[in-house]
Amino acid sequence: MSAKAQNPMRELKIEKLVLNISVGESGDRLTRASKVLEQLSGQTPVHSKARYTVRTFGIRRNEKIAVHVTIRGPKSEEILERGLKVKEYQLRTKNFSETGNFGFGIQEHIDLGIKYDPSIGIYGMDFYVVMGRPGGRVSRRKRCRSTVGNSHKTSKEDTIAWFKQRYDADVLDK
């Protein structure tokens, strides 16, 4: 912190971390991917369905094709740290959205420190991080809903600065 005390309501925080494994088909591979997410997060993953039929990929509408899990709190920070270690704390500017969220993918889940199990195999996964500030709930709640001012919304620049400072990381301009 600088000499002048920062406003605690302006501090960025991780609202949630979403881990997604998109298998592209239902069946045994999807249940094995579900086990990987359960091992990693300790929570039961949710299945995602296909929105529409794509004959070239062999996907039917409403067929379960992916699994994801939402993690909040300190556990999300710990899992994110493991994911960033795999990426060697380097992300690109295009990994960050205009609303201040960011995401990245890894090729192999065993890089996260999970022991390899031949019956499960190796899966890649996507990490999506939703950033926010205290007071952001006023725009989402049902009763007495209000708007958040532009100066209080999270921006791409704010998140990049937070990311560099928090994880001592690099953001590449590729």
From Swiss-Prot:
GO biological process, one term: translation
Places the protein is found: Nucleus; Cytoplasm
Origin superkingdom: Eukaryota
Keyword annotations from UniProtKB, A to Z: Cytoplasm, Nucleus, Ribonucleoprotein, Ribosomal protein, RNA-binding, rRNA-binding
GO cellular component: cytosolic large ribosomal subunit; nucleus
GO molecular function annotations of the record: RNA binding; rRNA binding; structural constituent of ribosome
Function description: Component of the ribosome, a large ribonucleoprotein complex responsible for the synthesis of proteins in the cell. The small ribosomal subunit (SSU) binds messenger RNAs (mRNAs) and translates the encoded message by selecting cognate aminoacyl-transfer RNA (tRNA) molecules. The large subunit (LSU) contains the ribosomal catalytic site termed the peptidyl transferase center (PTC), which catalyzes the formation of peptide bonds, thereby polymerizing the amino acids delivered by tRNAs into a polypeptide chain.
Family the entry assigns: Belongs to the universal ribosomal protein uL5 family.
Assembly and interaction partners: Component of the large ribosomal subunit.
NCBIfam families: PRK04219.1
Official protein name in the record: Large ribosomal subunit protein uL5
Source taxonomy: Eukaryota, Fungi, Dikarya, Ascomycota, Saccharomycotina
Gene: RPL11
